[in-house]
Amino acid sequence: MGTHVIKMPDIGEGIAEVELVEWHVQVGDSVNEDQVLAEVMTDKATVEIPSPVAGRILALGGQPGQVMAVGGELIRLEVEGAGNLAESPAAATPAAPVAATPEKPKEAPVAAPKAAAEAPRALRDSEAPRQRRQPGERPLASPAVRQRARDLGIELQFVQGSGPAGRVLHEDLDAYLTQDGSVARSGGAAQGYAERHDEQAVPVIGLRRKIAQKMQDAKRRIPHFSYVEEIDVTDLEALRAHLNQKWGGQRGKLTLLPFLVRAMVVALRDFPQLNARYDDEAEVVTRYGAVHVGIATQSDNGLMVPVLRHAESRDLWGNASEVARLAEAARSGKAQRQELSGSTITLSSLGVLGGIVSTPVINHPEVAIVGVNRIVERPMVVGGNIVVRKMMNLSSSFDHRVVDGMDAAAFIQAVRGLLEHPATLFLE
């Protein structure tokens, strides 16, 4: 038997370090060739690291949330044959491996499967039902168990694991549900008014850490100013309904988003200073002819901004189809690195949750972001009469270092004019 060291691979584009997001294995596991060992993140792209060989895990080289250098030791395996690490008294024992979690002493083999199945209930009978792990300690569980826990609304932090090294099994979830139900029944109506003293320490790692760093950097570096304008989209919504009725079956249903993209594309012809990126270190503003619109998209892991490239070159349905593809790729974690960078202006919409006013954060190094609020029906005065109209606010933010307030207001007024008179969206 020999020792095989797997190093953090170079995943391209000159990346010098990555963040370890999640282990898919633990010390003592046997792994096959090409089996996924871990997930790492660079910028906003998550990459799975497979094992190049089969073997048994001897040591893990880091904890989730840790930043690791490319070429650094990721994992050690015991393999058949000589391995790639020369055996010596010093090398026989890894110098400073980091286990996935603090290892418990291994227990003797269980005598019968029935005893293993009953272990979770025995543990829960002897311990407090809401006892949790130490802050920062990640519960061990398979992806299937984690997914089931999410579906059931269970925090794994509070589930006692009966597997090796405290690993949470499906039986532990069953036991937790059974015990949780009995507590709720015994508590009666007053249970909802009981004092709570539990707390949970959630490490800010992976995509959430990247979002935090990017938002902090943008707010620290960019002097934001926001501008809010209301828009009458009654005629636009009538046009959208007509197009969907006539062409929706053949070309797909249109949402409001491709109309907004089209309005921005047309308006930016007269305001190229807003379709730009500002290098504040070189003090250079680069204006772009191509309109690459970042589409702020919420995923299960956090905010992603896939890029609709060359929005000026597509019609409504072309942009709608590409936006749908990018949004699905972002939500499923399959977006490519190049699809998440290179935008020249960003469009942010919270849909029906859009509220009345928002103050979106600029996607640095861009100089503008257009925020879309929800559509509401309101009484408006038109031609001296009070009528019901569909109204929507645009809440936009700009970099005041390179964008003057008058230019920002004029740009939004141009977008407003296009949306309130939708036929002008298609005049060249």
Swiss-Prot record:
Region Disordered: start-end pairs: 88-145
Origin superkingdom: Bacteria
Similarity comment: Belongs to the 2-oxoacid dehydrogenase family.
GO function term, MF aspect, one: dihydrolipoyllysine-residue (2-methylpropanoyl)transferase activity
Transmembrane segments: none
Residue positions where N6-lipoyllysine is found in the record: 44
Organism of derivation: Pseudomonas aeruginosa (strain ATCC 15692 / DSM 22644 / CIP 104116 / JCM 14847 / LMG 12228 / 1C / PRS 101 / PAO1)
Reaction it catalyzes: N(6)-[(R)-dihydrolipoyl]-L-lysyl-[protein] + 2-methylpropanoyl-CoA = N(6)-[(R)-S(8)-2-methylpropanoyldihydrolipoyl]-L-lysyl-[protein] + CoA
Annotated Basic and acidic residues bias: 121-136
EC number in record: 2.3.1.168
Subunit structure, interactors included: Forms a 24-polypeptide structural core with octahedral symmetry.
Taxonomy of the source species: Bacteria, Pseudomonadati, Pseudomonadota, Gammaproteobacteria, Pseudomonadales
Domain Lipoyl-binding stretches: 3-78
Cofactor(s) named in the record: (R)-lipoate
Keywords: Acyltransferase, Glycolysis, Lipoyl, Transferase
Any GO CC annotation of this UniProt entry: cytoplasm
GO biological process terms held by the UniProt record: glycolytic process
Protein name as it appears in the record: Lipoamide acyltransferase component of branched-chain alpha-keto acid dehydrogenase complex
Active site: 400, 404
Gene coding for it: bkdB
CDD domains per UniProt: lipoyl_domain
Function: The branched-chain alpha-keto dehydrogenase complex catalyzes the overall conversion of alpha-keto acids to acyl-CoA and CO(2). It contains multiple copies of three enzymatic components: branched-chain alpha-keto acid decarboxylase (E1), lipoamide acyltransferase (E2) and lipoamide dehydrogenase (E3).
